[in-house]
Amino acid sequence: ISALTDEKYFQGSFDFLPSVSRIAPQPILCKDFIIDPYQIYLARHYQADACLLMLSVLDDEQYRQLAAVAHSLKMGVLTEVSNEEELERAIALGAKVVGINNRDLRDLSIDLNRTRQLAPRLGHGVTVISESGINTYGQVRELSHFANGFLIGSALMSHQDLHAAVRRVLLGENKVCG
C-alpha cells in the first residue's frame, strides 16, 4: 500500500504512514519526491516499510546513497522509471523492484504502452510494478502479463466507496443474479 507523504504537490503527510500501518497488514510504501536521506529516516520513523526513489529526479550517486540508507534501515526500495534511459540506469544500478510510471510527468498524459514496452527488458529476478493510469479490471488483467503488481491511486481515491472501487478494479464488474 502506498501513502503519499509529499505535502506541497499532493497534500500528503507523514502522519498517513502510521494511520495506514494500523489498519493494513501489508507493507507501506512512502511515496514522495525523496532527495535527501533525512526523508528516508523520517519515513522509517513513521513506520514505512519501503520508499520510492525516482530516477527522474536523482542521479546515480544520489540513488546509490539513498538506496543504501533505506537498506540499512531494512526498508525496501521501489525504483521508478518512466523512459528507456531511466530503465537502463535502473538495470545498471541493480534495482530489484522497478516501478514503470505510465504517466509522463511533464504533461501528465498516460500511456499504458510504457509498461508493455519497458517491462520485458527487465531480468527475471526483477519485480515489476506498473504505476499510474490503471482504472479497470481489463487493464489489470492485460498488464499482468508484464507486471507483478500495480500502484493504483486515482482510480480508487476518486470513489466514495473505496471497497467497491477496489473490487471493481481487481475483479471487474460482476453481476450476481439470484
Report residues per predicted region.
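Conserved strand-to-helix beginnings and helix N-cap segments that scaffold or border functional pockets
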Residues: 13-14, 63-64, 111-112, 140, ...
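N-terminal active-site wall of soluble small-molecule enzyme domains
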Residues: 2-78, 84-89, 115-118
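C-terminal helical cap(s) of enzyme catalytic domains, especially alpha/beta-barrels
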Residues: 115-122, 158-178
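A generic structural signal for alpha->beta connector loops
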Residues: 25, 74, 94, 125, ...
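Catalytic cores of alpha/beta
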Residues: 35-47, 82-94, 130-152, 164-169
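Catalytic-face loop-and-helix region of soluble metabolic enzyme cores
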Residues: 97-146
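Glycine-rich phosphate-binding active-site loops on the catalytic face of alpha/beta enzymes
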Residues: 42-62, 99-108, 146-166
